[in-house]
């Protein structure tokens, strides 16, 4: 073998090693996700999302900017005033949640090199497109200039209330769950298109899908917030699959005490929602 051929083999070998090393690095890279929301983002990301990712070897840092019932309009006011109005909950790579009070949007946006940032409307207004139209563009503009260009913005499609909900905001939808769900799906789809947001996380559709199973309308703990196991797990599965593009069906993680049938409902409801984010998929899963 002449010297030139040996040289080429060495160079090719080094390139292969570099590519393999790059692949390992990419797998080990910590993905940073921030939700600018309220108690519905608390339900979706503060538990189970870290564990679902960890089960597939994905390292995460997950943040939630929390004010109970916070609307897009209020987020915009807080941005304008640079108000230290948020509880900032942060789940580190170790899975432990820590909280800092009196935090501003500006401070939290600068806290990490965020890969994904989600926005959402407060539940009473979540199916009213005009409320997105009034506040979302300004909030997007505020956020974008404070984030790296690589950061992907997302819109969180939240869920309709339980059919028996006593929440005052249910009157906006004639106290009808399907009316509320369809209004949310339509408003979020329209808002995402109008504001060029390419990633919609269809938690609302996933919850509605799960309601077609043997579980029925038992995904909430108080008529509007999610049940702490099956409800929150369904939402977390949806976030996981939409962000990481890994089919969540078969993910080994489930919260303690959740049986296999309910685990299957949550995972399949989420998977179907990511495939069809604006329509309900009937699930034929028996207990």
Predicted regions and their residues:
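Conserved SGNH/GDSL esterase-like catalytic core that processes O-acyl groups on lipids
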Residues: 43-132
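Residues that mark the start of a beta-strand
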Residues: 30-32, 61
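Bacterial N-terminal signal peptides that target proteins for export
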Residues: 2-11
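Sec/Tat signal peptide C-region and signal peptidase I cleavage site
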Residues: 22-26
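Extracytoplasmic/secreted envelope proteins and their assembly/folding machinery
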Residues: 46-50, 133-140, 185, 236, ...
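Alpha-helical cap/lid subdomain in secreted, periplasmic
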Residues: 101-228, 241
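Conserved catalytic region of serine esterases and O-acyltransferases that act on ester linkages
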Residues: 29, 219, 223-287
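Bacterial N-terminal signal peptides
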Residues: 11-21
